[in-house]
Amino acid sequence: MLNPRIITIIIVILATPVLGISQEKLKVMVIFAHPDEGEIYAGGITALYTQLGHDVKFMSLTNGDAGHYAMKPKELAERRYKEAMRAKEILSLLEYEVLDYHDGILENTEEIRKKVASSIRDWEADVVFTFYPARGGHNDNMTAGWIVREASSLLDEEQMPVFIYMRDFHTASFSYIPDFAINIDEVWETKLAACGAHESQVIEYNPKMEGVLDEVLASKEIQADFLFHNTIPFSIVRPDIRLALEKWYGKEEAKEVTYVEEFEMAEYGRQMTDEDVFELLPMMGKVHKVSARADWLDTGIELSEGQIITIEANGQILWNLKERKYCNPDGAVPYTRGGNKPVLGAGTGALIGRIGEDATQCFLIGKNSKIHAFKSGRLYLGINDDNTQDNEGLYRVRIQVIK
């Protein structure tokens, strides 16, 4: 089992508009059976990834040409592709690949395994989300899970990503505790909109299957209600998910979560260490948000003299709007204009800290620091700049209290 650090806090410093450019972009893939399933089962975490500036690709192994009660397969496949492209825009995906295999009869062939392995290799994926490869349930979904699992054996060790399972409507009913639960409250509406882009499914096919087609077609309000109730079963906080939320967010934070997505480490592929978890799932954990234009961020962490903390930060901010100059948490060097930065000699835009709300003694943090608290007090974070009003962007900061 993966164990979170005893005290782990992720702090996000951002401004509007958000640049969302991390120190090193992650390359994420979500592989599933039908256009719309990436949105349903991983639309929330995808929105969080792209919000943070990471690159995400969706890959559907069928064209969805059987998911309708009236449309002909070719016409439906074309329509569902267009719907996928609308969802691509909503989620800010870089790519949405739809393979031209028929819906309902997906087979685990050498050809498709090679295509999947090639896509993973070409994308240079760091992490791949896909279905749990079980038996029973929907043929295509389960087959997709097996295809990805077996395709992983075609990858060289240096190309091997981390694989993470997402549970579909069948495997979600199994008794298990997910390894990860992601709070998607802030992107719930984005996920809902991405699912809603697939009108052939959420306005026509699914209502038809439930015997409410006429009612749904008659009212936009009922359509919105149906979309919500069609999506919410895969985003609710069940008791088993609550345990995973508490593990990574803490009990108090977990109580406040309304919408969630659950995931599980695959037993194949590269395995994550504790450090990898927050690197590959950077949105997970307690999150504080504050404008990069603000003076100081109150972390809420009370330090005692002599305590040791480690701080890791990544991201990028625009510290000079007029000249379009960017920097990472180490700051921009050199900088000669102005002399009233809190930490002289450190780069403009660098991540800095202080202990105590009114403290005048500040220190450089940068990308990585181990700090011995020289006095007791609350930890604050800030941006090393004599004028923060022209800043944009974000830093993501993880703080661990060692002792």
What do the PLM-derived regions correspond to, one by one?
Residues I40, Q271-T273, W319-K322:
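Short, solvent-exposed loop/turn elements at domain surfaces
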Residues L2, G20-I31, T109-M284:
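Metal-dependent de-N-acetylase/amidase catalytic core
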Residues T8-P17:
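Bacterial N-terminal signal peptides
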Residues G20-W123, S153-E157:
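Active-site rim/loop-helix segments in enzyme catalytic domains that contact anionic ligands
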Residues P35-E37, N63-A66, H102-L106, A134-G136, ...:
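Solvent-exposed loop/turn segments at secondary-structure junctions
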Residues M1-T8:
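Bacterial N-terminal signal peptides that target proteins for export
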Residues E78, M283-K403:
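Gly-Asp-aromatic-enriched flexible segments
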